[in-house]
Amino acid sequence: YPIEHGIVSNWDDMEKIWHHTFYNELRVAPEEHPVLLTEAPLNPK
């Protein structure tokens, strides 16, 4: 899984999930629907 304990640990797999979600589930073009990704301020680096 690309997320461990709420933190993205594998960005390549996470991008594949986003690609599938935008194109196959939502059926929208990601360049027309921006997403703001944030992280908690106390996440470990």
Swiss-Prot record:
<comment type="function">
    <text>Actins are highly conserved proteins that are involved in various types of cell motility and are ubiquitously expressed in all eukaryotic cells. Essential component of cell cytoskeleton; plays an important role in cytoplasmic streaming, cell shape determination, cell division, organelle movement and extension growth.</text>
</comment>
<keyword id="KW-0547">Nucleotide-binding</keyword>
<protein>
    <recommendedName>
        <fullName>Actin-1</fullName>
        <ecNumber>3.6.4.-</ecNumber>
    </recommendedName>
</protein>
<dbReference type="InterPro" id="IPR043129">
    <property type="entry name" value="ATPase_NBD"/>
</dbReference>
<dbReference type="Pfam" id="PF00022">
    <property type="entry name" value="Actin"/>
</dbReference>
<dbReference type="InterPro" id="IPR004000">
    <property type="entry name" value="Actin"/>
</dbReference>
<dbReference type="GO" id="GO:0016787">
    <property type="term" value="F:hydrolase activity"/>
</dbReference>
<comment type="similarity">
    <text>Belongs to the actin family.</text>
</comment>
<keyword id="KW-0378">Hydrolase</keyword>
<dbReference type="GO" id="GO:0005856">
    <property type="term" value="C:cytoskeleton"/>
</dbReference>
<keyword id="KW-0067">ATP-binding</keyword>
<keyword id="KW-0206">Cytoskeleton</keyword>
<keyword id="KW-0963">Cytoplasm</keyword>
<dbReference type="GO" id="GO:0005524">
    <property type="term" value="F:ATP binding"/>
</dbReference>
<dbReference type="GO" id="GO:0005737">
    <property type="term" value="C:cytoplasm"/>
</dbReference>
